Swiss-Prot record:
Residues 30-261 form the Laminin N-terminal domain. This is Netrin-4. PANTHER family: NETRIN-4, NETRIN/LAMININ-RELATED. CDD domains: EGF_Lam, NTR_netrin-4_like. May form a homodimer. Keywords: Basement membrane, Disulfide bond, Extracellular matrix, Glycoprotein, Laminin EGF-like domain, Repeat, Secreted, Signal. The gene is NTN4. Residues 262-331, 332-394, 395-448 form the Laminin EGF-like domain. Expressed in kidney, spleen, mammary gland, aorta, heart, ovary, prostate and fetal spleen.
């Protein structure tokens, strides 16, 4: 190839500079929008042609070249045979180095009117421009097509003709800028060395962001095809019909240069071979343009067309080649418990377009949009950072004493500290024992003790101590006694004493229910059915814990069923209380309340008798009918 061709290639480099290589912020570190290096996409790949000179047998061919005054030189003729390297003119010759092999070319068979040259790529590439250097006269008509689906469908890039209107019915871009047809590269001169140039970034695309959807539609290709539709003769060819037939009826091309780059959406500056692709063995393949991007900006895919697995917190975008903005993918906040996440547009919109990442398959017993909490059955170990694989520990709840999730057989605990939710009456961090005052650990929890204090957690038997005295099994049978005291018992004034402990030494007058008028005349504040639970010796007085089982009457104080304290006032110098209240027994008690303190008082004016249903009915009748 001559100096003209070399200058043409240098000019092609300026086209590159005006195209993708002019992206703002291109740097080796790809800090902003970036693009891989440009190169000849035909290098290392197979170019196809319909025919080849000498494909089946040796052929004779001739060609003209003109002088500077356009007069013809003597034609030169030679032989071609595709089977012999020194006589072959194969399609691969169009893709070798124009500088190292300037005298190599492809040539079609003789007498061919239509020919096709095609480049098939193994992936999507960005195509920027085409340079075709002809050895034969340029065609009178040709079409440049591209495919973006590996040859399934084709679209025209440009039509070339000496007369666009007559040949294709199209306007000429020499007359109307931007027209799809041109007559600029269809002159038969020069008879050899004529070029055809197409720039994919011609107006109106040359001012666009090179990674916008509009420009991608223009630049992306998987296949490129040139259809040579009409030959034309060199104008200096002689027309002497008496001469022997000359062999000029063929197409011949020195170079077929397809300039482009790996297609990476502005997110890579280097590419590697596509998996499984094997380059054609030919000179110059060291400079081959590969098709798989080495993605930056937290992107992934052969063309950096989506975000990396853990970087989907915002929607993927191509880089902006006009401003240089990289539009990096952003990491999802998965707290170290997920390997991937996905973008959810609903989450994105709900957050005000701030965060749309949802973590996938949370690991280490976590769950949630960000794997931000321990899943049911596990709790947060505050001694470990939450990003640690063992930050969520399994709940250790007792299977019998702990509650379970509704419609679930799995026990759970407080995810913040591991405390288990216990069944009624059950205690312990693991819910593995009865609370104090409860017994009978089982499937339904624990039952309340029938005592004022604690009881045996297994049997429910009341447990006595020197301060809380449970006498359920120790009190003597109730016997009516008279009001005649036994000889005095010497004791220190400061010493407290429980009448219940020494009830046998107290002689109290037996009470009977007299007439209704006398009962009503006492104007009792309360009338209760109670069960005596225990007595507490306070030193200066006695407190009796009872369980109120029924409220027959209450006045100013609101009295409810349940545990309550009675305060006996009858305190002799021997420490006896009357009337006697024996633990474990049920009584009907009518007494007065201390308005100032709210205490329920029991004294000699109180009415106390063992509970009988008949007694209860009789007192209720008196309260309703007589005590008005």
């Amino acid at each position: 190839m001559g100096s003209c061709a070399r200058l043409l290639l240098l000019w092609g480099c300026t086209v590159v500079a005006a195209g993708l290589s002019g992206v703002a912020g291109v740097s080796s570190r790809c800090e902003k929008a970036c693009n891989p290096r440009m190169g000849n996409l035909a290098l290392g790949r197979k170019l196809w042609a319909d025919t080849t000179c000498g494909q089946n047998a040796t052929e004779l061919y001739c060609f003209y070249s003109e002088n500077t005054d356009l007069t013809c030189r003597q034609p030169k003729c030679d032989k071609c045979n595709a089977a012999y390297p020194h006589l072959a003119h194969l399609p691969s010759a169009m893709a070798d180095s124009s500088f190292r092999f300037p005298r190599t070319w492809w040539q079609s068979a003789e007498d061919v009117h239509r020919e096709k040259i095609q480049l098939d790529l193994e992936a999507e590439f960005y195509f920027t421009h085409l340079i075709v250097m002809f050895k034969s006269p340029r065609p009178a008509a040709m079409v440049l097509d591209r495919s973006q689906d590996f040859g399934k469908t084709w679209k025209p890039y440009k039509y070339f003709a000496t007369n666009c209107s007559a040949t294709f019915g199209l306007e000429d871009d020499v007359v109307k800028k931007g027209a799809i047809c041109t007559s600029k590269y269809s002159s038969p001169f020069p008879c050899t060395g004529g070029e055809v140039i197409f720039k994919a970034l011609s107006p109106p695309y040359d001012t666009e962001n090179p990674y916008s959807a509009k420009v991608q539609e223009q630049l992306k290709i998987t296949n490129l095809r040139v259809q040579l539709l009409k030959r034309q003769s060199c104008p200096c060819q002689r027309n002497d019909l008496n001469e022997e037939p000359q062999h000029f009826t063929h197409y011949a091309i020195y170079d077929f240069i397809v300039k482009g780059s790996c297609f990476c959406n502005g997110h890579a500056d280097q590419c590697i071979p596509v998996h499984g692709f094997r380059p054609v063995k030919a000179p110059g393949t060291f400079h081959m343009v590969h098709g798989k991007c080495m993605c930056k900006h937290n992107t992934a895919g052969s063309h950096c067309q989506h975000c990396a697995p853990l970087y989907n917190d915002r929607p993927w975008e191509a880089a902006d080649g006009k401003t240089g903005a990289p539009n990096e993918c952003r990491t999802c906040k998965c707290n170290g418990h997920a390997d991937t996440c996905h973008f959810d547009v609903n989450v994105w919109e709900a957050s005000g377009n701030r965060s749309g990442g949802v973590c996938d398959d949370c690991q280490h017993n976590t769950e949630g949009q960000y794997c931000q909490r321990c899943k049911p059955g596990f709790y947060r170990d505050l001694r470990r950072p939450f990003s640690a694989p063992d930050a969520c520990k399994p709940c250790s709840c007792h299977p019998v004493g702990s509650a379970v999730l509704p419609a679930n057989s799995v026990t759970f605990c407080d995810p913040s500290n591991g405390d288990c939710p216990c069944k009624p009456g059950v205690a312990g961090r693991r819910c593995d024992r009865c609370m104090v005052g409860y017994w009978g650990f089982g499937d339904y929890g624990c039952r309340p003790c029938d005592c004022a204090g604690s009881c045996d957690p297994i049997t429910g038997d009341c447990i006595s101590s020197h301060t809380d005295i449970d006498w359920y099994h120790e009190v003597p049978d109730f016997r009516p006694v008279h009001n005649k005291s036994e000889p005095a018992w010497e004791w220190e004034d400061a010493q407290g004493f429980s009448a219940l402990l020494h009830s046998g030494k107290c002689e109290c007058k037996e009470q009977t229910l007299g007439n209704a008028k006398a009962f009503c005349g006492m104007k009792y504040s309360y009338v209760l059915k109670i069960k005596i639970l225990s007595a507490h010796d306070k030193g200066t007085h006695v407190e009796v814990n009872v369980k109120i089982k029924k409220v027959l009457k209450s006045t100013k104080l609101k009295i409810f069923r349940g545990k309550r304290t009675l305060y006996p006032e009858s305190w002799t110098d021997r420490g006896c209380t009357c009337p006697i209240l024996n633990p474990g027994l049920e009584y009907l008690v009518a007494g007065h309340e201390d308005i100032r303190t709210g205490k329920l008082i029991v004294n000699m004016k109180s009415f106390v008798q063992h509970w009988k249903p008949s007694l209860g009915r009789k007192v209720m009748d008196i309260l309703k009918r007589e005590c008005k």
